[in-house]
Curated annotation (Swiss-Prot):
GO cellular component terms given for this protein: extracellular region
Protein name in the entry: Caerin-3.4
GO biological process, one term: defense response to bacterium
Expression by tissue: Expressed by the skin parotoid and/or rostral glands.
Organism: Ranoidea caerulea (Green tree frog)
Length: 22
């Protein structure tokens, strides 16, 4: 559903931020 897609995108953003901090 819609929430799954939103959460998936949010996880990608968080992962990108974490990678940027490393």
């Amino acid at each position: 559903g819609l929430w799954e897609k939103i959460r998936e995108k949010a996880n990608e953003l968080v992962s990108g931020i974490v990678e940027g901090v490393k």
